[in-house]
Regions:
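Non-transmembrane "mature" sequence context
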Residues: 1-173
Length: 173
């Protein structure tokens, strides 16, 4: 369905379009795919505010994410074992929580990577559950490993991202 409007929309007064689970973050305004993905990432990490570009995301990683971002990821369907294997070991996370420390830059980067790729999978498959299911199922392309296993490394995450874009464009199954 194409929405038409006669006058520019003030994003601060934008109407929320509801229809699918992820639509709660879509505003009735002209938003690029990148902006939408940045909004999804922020939501998954439990962060408020608006990122204007990927450069803002880099700055966020450099400032280090709060530990509550891990809790937000768990609330969005990421499993504890996935947190421990992709982002931060269990004991390290326990220490960070006890000391009320932020995640390290590396952990923050991995958290953003996980949020970005789970958001992309949800977008491609049209549903959060379907996206997570795809990420957790072994794939021949990944030599029998799951996409979630591949996300643990930057190189693996690039392959997962490439595969998701190919699926989205109808070039892969």
């Amino acid at each position: 369905m194409q929405l038409k409007r006669k006058e520019p929309v003030d994003p601060l007064k934008a109407t929320v379009i509801v229809g699918k689970p992820w639509d709660e973050i879509f505003a009735y305004a002209e938003i690029s795919k990148g902006d939408v993905m940045l909004s999804w990432i922020m939501k998954k990490l439990g962060l408020r505010g608006t990122l204007k570009s990927e450069a803002d995301l880099v700055a966020l990683v450099e400032e280090r994410l709060p530990v509550v971002s891990i809790s937000a990821l768990l609330e969005h369907g990421i499993l504890e074992k996935e947190i421990y294997s992709v982002i931060v070991p269990r004991r390290t996370l326990q220490h960070r929580r006890a000391r009320e420390e932020k995640l390290s830059r590396e952990e923050s980067d991995r958290a953003v990577r996980l949020a970005r790729l789970t958001s992309l999978a949800e977008k491609v498959f049209g549903d959060p559950d379907a996206g997570r299911h795809w990420l957790r199922a072994p794939k021949k392309r990944f030599r029998g490993r799951t996409p979630m296993d591949m996300i643990a490394t930057e190189t693996g995450s690039r392959l997962v991202e490439e595969t998701l874009y190919q699926i989205d464009e109808g070039m892969a199954a």
